[in-house]
Amino acid sequence: MLNPAGSKGSGLRLAALALCLSAAGCAGGARPVVTMPQAADWRIEAEQAAFVTFGDVIDIETPAGLSLWYARELKGPVAIEFDALAVSEGGANDEVSDLNAFWMAGDPHVRGGSVFAKKRSGAFAEYDDLKTYYVGIGGNRNTTTRFRRYVGEPGNRPLLPGHDLKGAENLLVPNRWTHVRLIADGRTIAVERDGRRIFALDDAQPYARGWFALRTTKSHLRIRNLRIGKP
């Protein structure tokens, strides 16, 4: 067992996760090259004791805010894709809510921009000072789906009118897999879900490098087929 950063007593069972790194085999439309990184390549920031396991599926069960960071910095252009399922099986944390992610995240207040230079508790507001792209699918207890471009200012999480979706077609369905694709390709920043582009931003000052995290709060999520490669 390991104690994740910011969460005393949280359990982490070690195994392997299939992941495609941003490598030559991922470029040019080629099938992604799948690798098996060590569990040490991941960092957990959790408000309360949480349980995360790795295998063919990443299982994340948490009673409060949790960010699961891939520890290696990514450089654009990049596409991150995965399948996700919101578990509803009667468990204590089986709330269908908050399939979220940060990508191209950096801390503008520290040299090098590392998101790990400052210890964070896993509370959502503690990420306000990052420059990052953020998507929240089924946030606010599965009532909203939103995209934001953080600007590194505490208390300021800009939200454009077209980046705040409601309606059942934009929310999570219990126990059903959904495919998510996060894109940072020069000025083109986008989120795709099940083959449909739900958010797009023409960013005149794009975040071209940074870190990726899965993010949730009081929920039980399963993640599989995670790949990081070229758009």
Question: Which residues make up each language-model segment?
Answer:
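Bacterial N-terminal signal peptides
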Residues: 15-24
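Extracellular glycan-recognition regions
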Residues: 26-231
